UniProtKB/Swiss-Prot annotation:
It comes from the Archaea. It comes from Pyrococcus abyssi (strain GE5 / Orsay). It catalyses: pretRNA = a 3'-half-tRNA molecule with a 5'-OH end + a 5'-half-tRNA molecule with a 2',3'-cyclic phosphate end + an intron with a 2',3'-cyclic phosphate and a 5'-hydroxyl terminus. The keyword Lyase applies. One of its GO terms (biological process) is tRNA splicing, via endonucleolytic cleavage and ligation. GO terms for cellular component: cytoplasm. HAMAP family: EndA_short. NCBIfam families: endA. It is an enzyme of class 4 (lyase). Belongs to the tRNA-intron endonuclease family. Archaeal short subfamily. This is tRNA-splicing endonuclease.
Length: 170
């Protein structure tokens, strides 16, 4: 990407109406959600793209730094930091990462150029507890929509470890 694309802050996301944003970010790389002629990005996507130097985010006429976008995200979601680490790790590995809110998970993950996602990702801190009932419910939903359930565990050193959890029938 050569020229930085301008996005504008709007609540808990950012948007651009520039055709370049739609072509380069949405069509070619799977970022955001297209509504009419606007490309909307989540704060996690925006933070990632600002950190990479691909976009800049304006609030009124003032450009927001990566740290300011991160703080906005953290105010809206106390787990923004660990979700960002997982998002960044998956994107850096070449996967397309989208919200999985409607599936009761944090992210759905696609292989590049795939039409359907393979995985649902639930992000947890290593110190968090997850009840067997919660885990079972998440695996059932994933199985019901033909996806693999993956727990992304972030440790105290901010390293991410992925655990695939499967439904087994005997």
């Amino acid at each position: 990407m050569k020229k930085v694309i301008e996005f504008y802050l709007s609540g808990d996301r950012v948007y651009s109406t520039r055709e370049k944003a739609i072509n380069q970010l949405y069509n070619n790389r799977g970022y955001g959600e297209l509504k009419g002629n606007k490309l909307f990005l989540s704060l996690i996507e925006a933070a990632y793209l600002v950190e990479r130097g691909w976009i800049k985010v304006l609030d009124e006429d003032r450009e927001l730094t990566f740290e300011e976008i991160f703080k906005l995200g953290k105010r809206k979601d106390e787990d923004f930091d660990i979700k960002y680490l997982v998002y960044k790790d998956l994107r850096d590995r070449g996967y397309i990462v989208k919200s999985a809110l409607k599936f009761g998970s944090h992210f759905r993950v696609y292989r590049k150029n795939a039409e359907h996602s393979d995985w649902l990702i639930w992000v947890l801190r290593e110190s968090e507890k997850l009840s067997p009932n919660d885990m079972t419910a998440r695996v059932r939903v994933a199985h019901g929509v033909r996806k693999n359930m993956v727990m992304a565990i972030v440790d105290e050193d901010n390293d991410v470890v992925y655990y695939k959890i499967e439904w087994i029938k005997f």
